[in-house]
Amino acid sequence: SIVSHAQGLGYSPRSKTSSQTNVNLTLNLAGVSNRNTTYTLPAFTLFTTSINDITYTFQTTESLTATDNGSGLYEFSDVNGNKNVILFEGTKRTKKFYVGKVGERQIYVIPDSTMDTATTIVKVFANPSTTEFEPYTPISKAIRVDQNSKFYQITEAPNGFYELNFGDGISFGQAPETGTVVQVEYLSTVGADANGGQVFSP
């Protein structure tokens, strides 16, 4: 097929892309007694904006922290101290796959045509009841790959959706083991329709 031929050439068609906006987030507690020294804004905190009377949802994709400047003003920043915070349009969605027996063909297709593949986060849990997980990294960010590397690749499936692929212990790293749970988190987006927002409200 055209899709498989394109993948053989190292190409995978782009998915929809979430609109992004840069904002400065502040919290003013001047005059408030017993305020905390530091506040945290969790990842996936929601904001909304309206364009032509249509409301769109944006959100953070990482936790942000802010420290009292001494006057009750807090400016939120990311882990690198950057106060120019990026909000992404979209709705967070989660898909889980249970890894079958060795030798079985494992298929991890995300049946969502609105997926922004660039926002994908892949976590592998040892079993369905644990909260601890191993993060997997996009193969595009690999510097060195061996049989123990934990990478994933997203390609287009024949039905037009996107498929998650792992290594086999030889090609591009380690595949999730039998009995583990693969959890995929991503943003479902409307694409360019959400461009142009000016005012964002929590």
Where are these regions (language model features)?
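Signature of Asx- and small-polar-rich beta-strand/turn repeats characteristic
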Residues: 1-202
